[in-house]
C-alpha cells in the first residue's frame, strides 16, 4: 500500500477527509492541482478502518456491478466504467451495496492509477492509510415513503439506485412511494423489480439529468 502523505486532504476529497455522515451510495472524488492522466492499470480500494479488511476493489477499465439490495433474490449484473477523470478531478464509482451504516472506512489508490499528477503541490505516488482519507457513514437508513436524492446537497441518498434499493427492500410492492431528484447529474445504470407504484420526479425538466452511456456491446439486453 502506498505510504505517501499529502498534508490536509479536507477540501480535496468527497467524502471529505474525516467526514462523519457520509452517504453509502456516493461517488469518491479526489481533486488534484492540475488535470491528471489515467494510467493503464491500477485500483482504488476501500478498507474498513477497524480491522483493515477490504470492502471494495474498484479496477481501472471495465468492472461488473450487481444492482439491487443486499440479499435480494434477483440482481441486475452490469458492466460499467467505474473510474474517470474530469478536469482536475478523479471520479470513482464504488460497487453497489459495499458500505454499511455507522462504519468507518479509508480509501487507498494504487501508484500508477493516474500519472503526471500533483496533490497539494506534491508529486502523486498513490495514496494509502497514512494519507488519512477516512470517513464514517451515516448512522441509519432513512424511513418513510417520500425520498429525496441529491448529488451534492442534503438528502436521503446520493443516487437514484440507492433510493430504488431502499424501496425494493423496505416497502410492500403496492405501497406508493415517491422519489424526488434534485437538479443535478445522475450517471448511473438502474434496476427496479417487484414494485408497482413508484413515482420518480425531477426538480426540473432541464436540469435533472439521469443517463448512462449504455450500449449493446457493454450490456446486452437488460443485464442478468
Describe the function of each predicted region.
Residues 182, 193, 201-203:
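Feature marks extracellular polysaccharide-active and adherence modules
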Residues 152-153, 197-224:
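Right-handed parallel beta-helix/beta-spiral solenoid domain characteristic of secreted/periplasmic
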Residues 156-158, 186, 190-195, 220-224:
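Folded extracytoplasmic luminal domains of secretory or organellar precursors
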Residues 2-141:
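Acidic, low-complexity Ser/Thr/Gly/Pro-rich repeat segments typical of extracellular/periplasmic
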Amino acid at each position: 500500500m502506498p505510504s505517501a502523505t499529502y498534508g490536509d486532504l479536507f477540501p480535496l476529497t468527497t467524502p471529505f477527509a474525516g467526514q462523519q455522515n457520509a452517504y453509502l451510495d456516493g461517488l469518491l472524488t479526489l481533486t488534484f492541482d492540475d488535470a491528471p492522466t489515467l494510467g493503464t492499470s491500477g485500483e482504488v480500494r476501500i478498507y474498513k478502518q477497524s480491522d483493515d479488511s477490504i470492502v471494495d476493489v474498484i479496477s481501472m477499465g471495465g468492472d461488473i456491478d450487481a444492482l439491487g439490495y443486499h440479499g435480494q433474490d434477483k440482481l441486475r449484473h452490469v458492466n460499467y466504467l467505474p473510474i474517470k477523470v474530469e478536469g482536475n478531478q478523479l471520479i470513482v464509482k464504488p460497487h453497489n451495496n459495499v458500505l454499511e451504516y455507522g462504519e468507518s472506512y479509508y480509501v487507498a489508490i494504487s501508484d500508477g492509477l493516474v500519472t503526471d499528477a500533483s496533490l497539494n503541490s506534491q508529486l502523486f505516488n498513490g495514496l494509502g492509510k497514512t494519507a488519512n482519507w477516512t470517513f464514517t457513514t451515516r448512522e441509519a437508513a432513512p424511513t418513510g415513503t417520500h425520498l429525496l436524492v441529491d448529488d451534492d446537497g442534503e438528502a436521503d441518498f446520493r443516487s437514484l439506485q440507492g433510493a430504488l434499493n431502499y424501496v425494493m427492500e423496505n416497502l410492500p410492492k403496492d405501497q406508493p412511494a415517491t422519489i424526488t431528484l434534485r437538479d443535478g447529474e445522475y450517471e448511473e445504470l438502474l434496476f427496479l423489480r417487484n414494485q408497482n407504484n413508484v413515482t420518480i420526479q425531477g426538480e426540473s425538466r432541464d436540469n435533472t439529468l439521469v443517463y448512462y452511456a449504455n450500449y449493446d456491446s457493454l450490456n446486452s439486453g437488460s443485464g442478468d
